[in-house]
Amino acid sequence: MDQDAFFFERDPEAEGEAPRKQESLSDVIGLLDVVLSYKPTEIGEDRSWLHGIIDNPKENKPSCKADDNNKDRAISTPTQDHRSGEESGISRRTSESKTETHARILDQQGIHRASRRGTSPNPLPENMGNERNTRIDEDSPNERRHQRSVLTDEDRKMAEDSNKREEDQVEGFPEEIRRSTPLSDDGESRTNNNGRSMETSSTHSTRITDVIINPSPELEDAVLQRNKRRPTIIRRNQTRSERTQNSELHKSTSENSSNLEDHNTKTSPKGPPPKNEESAATPKNNHNHRKTKYTMNNANNNTKSPPTPEHDTTANEEETSNTSVDEMAKLLVSLGVMKSQHEFELSRSASHVFAKRMLKSANYKEMTFNLCGMLISVEKSLENKVEENRTLLKQIQEEINSSRDLHKRFSEYQKEQNSLMMANLSTLHIITDRGGKTGDPSDTTRSPSVFTKGKDNKVKKTRFDPSMEALGGQEFKPDLIREDELRDDIKNPVLEENNNDLQASNASRLIPSTEKHTLHSLKLVIENSPLSRVEKKAYIKSLYKCRTNQEVKNVMELFEEDIDSLTN
């Protein structure tokens, strides 16, 4: 709600008329007891009558000396009430509401005395509901609104200074108020925060400047803090001209409210009003008296009394709450957790929001509540990170398994390729083993580089005939039969080196070796023989010079003959 709704304005001409009274602290305590003992506001009922135009001419002051006919005359408003049963009681109630203020002041003095003794006339808890559904008081169905006096030129001044008042509203309020739920610091609109903001949801209108909502303890504390000394850390960029304008605005509002109190006390009661009308007019006139007395007290406190230690403690609390948030943001930036201080202030992370609320909390109850929220949010975020890491580990494990399968298949494919390459190399080795020469490779005669023309002996090509297989020649027999016959022809197992090549794989021919297995075994036989050392060397040297199997066979026959001659 609008904070300036607690203050009535008055003309600056009438400044000297109202003597300023020095209110004691007991009056303030009694006022707060009255507020706390008042009826709770109710939700969901009609409060459209609050927006009606309040139209009372300036001739109110001499009206107390006029005739009874002028007092009984009702002032009509543009918004007509269509309920038919109320017309007779309107004029009486509007005039008698003025005469009740003196009697109500006496009642409130009795309430103050009762509150000092520890009793209250109606100790009901206050309940501040949603600001869109809150209404002032509980009206019976056949009662109508009473009129309040307002000055048209003051309305104009209020409309002109609306921007200044909005800046003044934002200036002095902390983010959270004692005994209230913490305000959300996410920058949402003030129209949707369940009645916790300190200003009205609509823009300023001159029609509803005097609308008063039953103040709850939260609003009372808020207005008390508003009138205390304000910390300089809240508005650093406020210029000196704005401060002077705001102070002048507060002075004018407090002086106008004291003038209105004088005007209300001058009206003399003509007679006791009926009970049903008194029940309707009592809460609203209570607002008038409470509001004027309250503003007088605040004005006197602002002008005459020095700041109390309570003012200093609340200001220090606000300063420490703001400085603690700034220090936390700077520490996070210096540690590298946040990039900038602005990022921490605008962060929407749950743990960050709870941390900011905990630093700004007013008491230990809110601090523990926000601490629990921060711990739960941190635990939830850690659980989410653990789940993300688990999913990542599962994905990595699946990728590793797939890569293992790929590696296994690739190694098998590589083995196949290696075997094919070795087979191709072995065929190339067979072709180029003797340099393409068909004759004896030991013949080292140089062939001439220039060939003269001569007769070439043309070899006749014989066509293959199946009858050739019956012939004795090996060249016309099929490969399978030829292999079997060659195996059968082998008699000496020591000399089967070339025949074994038919069964061996192609890759085994490329295995590097200094000497063949057959030559090695024959060399061992010669070395273990009882021949002399010179003869052994001669036989081994002749073995290495052999090119065909027949030569090896001849050398070994000679060796056997020598051994037989020695043994015999």
Curated annotation (Swiss-Prot):
GO BP: DNA-templated transcription; viral genome replication
UniProt keyword annotations, A-Z: Coiled coil, Phosphoprotein, Viral RNA replication
Coiled coil: 387-416
SUPFAM superfamilies (alphabetical): Multimerization domain of the phosphoprotein from sendai virus (SSF58034), Phosphoprotein XD domain (SSF101089)
Region (L protein binding), start-end ranges: 412-445
Pfam families: Paramyxo_P
Sequence segments annotated as region (N0 binding): 33-41
Regions of compositional bias (Basic and acidic residues) in chain numbering: 7-24, 56-105, 132-144, 151-167, 239-253
Chain spans, region Interaction with the nucleocapsid (N-RNA): 479-568
InterPro entries xrefs: Paramyxo_PProtein_C (IPR002693), PProtein_oligomer_dom1 (IPR043097), RNA_pol_Pprot-P_XD_paramyxovir (IPR016075)
Domain of life of the organism encoding this protein: Viruses
Compositionally biased intervals (Polar residues): 190-208, 294-305, 441-450
Region (Disordered): 1-24, 45-324, 434-455
The keyword Glycosyltransferase appears for this protein: no
Keyword rRNA-binding: no
Sequence segments annotated as region (Multimerization): 344-411
Entry's free-text remark on domains: The N-terminus consists of a long intrinsically disordered tail. The central part contains the coiled-coil multimerization domain (PMD). Forms a four-stranded coiled coil structure. The C-terminus constitutes the alpha-helical domain that binds to the nucleocapsid (N-RNA complex).
Family to which the UniProt record says this protein belongs: Belongs to the respirovirus P protein family.
Subunit structure: Homotetramer. Interacts (via multimerization domain) with polymerase L; this interaction forms the polymerase complex. Interacts (via N-terminus) with N0; this interaction allows P to chaperon N0 before encapsidation and form the N-P complex. Interacts (via C-terminus) with N-RNA template; this interaction positions the polymerase on the template.
The protein's name: Phosphoprotein
